[in-house]
Amino acid sequence: MQEEVFNELAELALKGSGQAIPKSKSYLIEARLAAIARREGFGTMADLVHCLKSRANPVFAAEVASALVSKDTCFFRDRDALKRVVDDVLPKRLKASNTGRLKVWCAGGSTGQEAYSLAILLEDELPASLRGAKIDILSTDICKVSTETARVARYGHYEVQKGLSIHR
């Protein structure tokens, strides 16, 4: 892939999602955009970039940016971070709140496993300092397909097996 083409697509990923794609991972760009390029009839990634630059189509640009981002996720992917949120962050935020209500936003939440992991952890290991609190968890993502998967919370055997114990 030409360096200029890589730079344009990497910039689109960064602006559209906040995810940086290093030059060493340029093969990911081609792999992630292959289906879109075929569907749209582009022979090369340069043709796709030319289309993005010559025709202002925010819907298509968002689709390309969404295809570029990593969707690697699983339940309890970073259990230590989730524990810190439950044991430290949420109790401090609740103490600072006068409402007894907390809102947690999982930005870049992909298909929802992290948000559901947080909910499971809160259910299983609710600290005394959070009892009685109303906690809302919202997961968002730039990929509409991922957001819909999170909304319906229907996961296959592989997704469930990857991160959840047999006790859950």
Where do the protein language model's features map onto the residues?
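Short, well-ordered amphipathic alpha-helices
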Residues: 84-93, 115-126
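Conserved AdoMet
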Residues: 1-105
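Extended basic-aromatic, gly/pro-enriched interface segments that bind polyanionic ligands
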Residues: 107, 128-168
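A short linear boundary/processing microfeature
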Residues: 54, 91, 124, 128, ...
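Conserved class I S-adenosyl-L-methionine
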Residues: 98-118, 136-138
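Short, internal active-site loops enriched in acidic
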Residues: 34-35, 110-112, 142-145
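Conserved strand-to-helix beginnings and helix N-cap segments that scaffold or border functional pockets
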Residues: 26, 79, 115-119, 151
